[in-house]
UniProtKB/Swiss-Prot annotation:
Pathway: Cofactor biosynthesis; pyrroloquinoline quinone biosynthesis. The keyword Iron does not apply. One of its GO terms (biological process) is pyrroloquinoline quinone biosynthetic process. CDD domains: PQQB-like_MBL-fold (cd16274). Pfam families: Lactamase_B_2 (PF12706). PANTHER family: COENZYME PQQ SYNTHESIS PROTEIN B (PTHR42663:SF7), HYDROLASE C777.06C-RELATED-RELATED (PTHR42663). Keywords: PQQ biosynthesis, Transport. The gene is pqqB. The lineage of its organism: Bacteria, Pseudomonadati, Pseudomonadota, Gammaproteobacteria, Pseudomonadales. May be involved in the transport of PQQ or its precursor to the periplasm. This is Coenzyme PQQ synthesis protein B. Gene3D superfamilies: Ribonuclease Z/Hydroxyacylglutathione hydrolase-like. It comes from Pseudomonas entomophila (strain L48).
Amino acid sequence: MYIQILGSAAGGGFPQWNCNCVNCKGYRDGTLRASARTQSSIALSDDGEHWILCNASPDIRAQLQAFAPMQPARALRDTGINAIVLLDSQIDHTTGLLSLREGCPHQVWCTDMVHQDLTTGFPLFNMLSHWNGGLVWNRIELEGSFVIEACPNLRFTPFPLRSAAPPYSPHRFDPHPGDNLGLLVEDTRTGGKLFYAPGLGQVDDKLLQMMGGADCLLVDGTLWEDDEMQRRGVGTRTGREMGHLAQNGPGGMLEVLDGFPRQRKVLIHINNTNPILDEDSPERAEVVRRGVEVAFDGMSLKL
């Protein structure tokens, strides 16, 4: 299984266009040793030619341009994208679909709840129906697993995560299973397994068991501290309120990952305020000391 990190930042990217926090300002001033990052998205393949896009960020055009296999040039109009899987209906995971309209029809896999959001509060399916067949919905059931024809050796097992629907959603304050998903992806030839959960607010025993059976854990790296947004003066909500488990402290993501010494562990969906973006910070050093990697745009993994 080929795993390509197209984008590794949380919503807004890094540096965020309107932010002058210590990280964003330091990057622009050249006083911070860090890499710019686009908004979170990955691509998966079983042969390096046919790719499944997981989430479509607003930065999708630049992400595809930076990864040559996404333009195989086999025809006058071509793409390496063969299907799209949406883990939720968040704006920073779906607006990239608008930029992909010239390539319609696209096979899009998502849950009933995500499809409902994307036909009501943010009606992308309706809007893009006017472009050559638009978005073709394939339902993700919350039980069992599924295979996408373009990559027949990859088996996807979805699992619901506890988190809210987007602010625009008609059921924002009425959460349902299927609003947010993680994925366990297995290459049935190699046996390699990826646990992918870029929005992980709570880890229960069932998830711990799934993580223990995976070879690579690609998980939520949004915040270092739960109250980081408040500390930095850029927001009022905590990580838990937004559905993100912070890395630091008792019960934090690093402590969770300490329990998996065998697995490759990678943090993704990193907010612009997170000090681990600073490659010289003590927080980054602590992450490295504990055997955890920080995802970057263009990172390639293979299982």
